[in-house]
Amino acid sequence: MTTHLLVTGAAGFIGSQYVRTLLGPGGPPDVVVTALDALTYAGNPDNLAAVRGHPRYRFERGDICDAPGRRVMAGQDQVVHLAAESHVDRSLLDASVFVRTNVHGTQTLLDAATRHGVASFVQVSTDEVYGSLEHGSWTEDEPLRPNSPYSASKASGDLLALAHHVSHGLDVRVTRCSNNYGPRQFPEKLIPRFITLLMDGHRVPLYGDGLNVREWLHVDDHVRGIEAVRTRGRAGRVYNIGGGATLSNKELVGLLLEAAGADWGSVEYVEDRKGHDRRYAVDSTRIQRELGFAPAVDLADGLAATVAWYHKHRSWWEPLVPAGSLPA
């Protein structure tokens, strides 16, 4: 039986990887994908070049807040909602676009999905909604304590989605991932920003004392986790998706310096980010036990492959840097 699947944010880093995986070798043969993206600064149609012309694929340009974005909901069986504004530093400069896309846009999609009788809706979110913790790891039952406008907007979207499940009976499943990395990530994010700066012999900025801790998840593993939730997840359930590799930013920079053949003279310590969460780590026991998911990409191997990709694809990232670069 054919499943018509709407993927929002499909031209972005994670969304495009998800679409390419669905329509690539080993992907489900019965899924017809409608890829929706507004093509704002981080949405790149070249990310979807590999699936252009695929018989089970069509692309629609549209804003999830507007009528064209809502109209594509008609005829869809499932939704995987990845469209979002996602850079914390940008949210500190102007939160309004984050509220518009991540809150109002999510609400608009949920209303449309309910109206059109969509069978299931996967809300793709972030571990940043939990806030910061000193030790241990968050389970899905932790209270939400977002500390940035970005994470607050994502938490709001999560709560709206789960409320639609309770109030309207919409099958909603929420995923919350740790920090992602991999090919085609927009070069304002920490790993690609540092890789591209080091490639050109520039110094890289490291916030505060560099001891803020993050858990890293390769994008290939993330999209496998999303697909596990889409196909086997339970309605009204939240699933953490972690990569299992927890490092301080200073430790991560050390690995990137080594990969680039650079030393610590290439690092410039800068004033810490406002409200910078000290530590993130998620407990992924639920998705492992219930859905059989576990990350497969080793951090060292994944970083090496990511560095190699940015070296090989300068023509992809170089035009993007002047348009939207911020300190990582």
Curated annotation (Swiss-Prot):
It comes from the Bacteria. Keywords: Antibiotic biosynthesis, Lyase, NAD, Streptomycin biosynthesis. It catalyses: dTDP-alpha-D-glucose = dTDP-4-dehydro-6-deoxy-alpha-D-glucose + H2O. Its cofactor is NAD(+). Its EC number is 4.2.1.46. The keyword Lyase applies. Substrate binds at residues 86, 126, 179, 189-190, 205-207, 214, 249, 272-276. It is an enzyme of class 4 (lyase). GO terms for biological process: nucleotide-sugar metabolic process; polysaccharide biosynthetic process; streptomycin biosynthetic process. GO terms for molecular function: dTDP-glucose 4,6-dehydratase activity. The keyword Lyase applies. The active site is at residues 127-128, 150. Signal peptide: none annotated. Binds 1 NAD(+) per subunit. Belongs to the NAD(P)-dependent epimerase/dehydratase family. dTDP-glucose dehydratase subfamily. Homodimer. Involved in the biosynthesis of the streptose moiety of streptomycin. Catalyzes the dehydration of dTDP-D-glucose to form dTDP-6-deoxy-D-xylo-4-hexulose via a three-step process involving oxidation, dehydration and reduction. This is dTDP-glucose 4,6-dehydratase. It comes from Streptomyces griseus. The gene is strE.
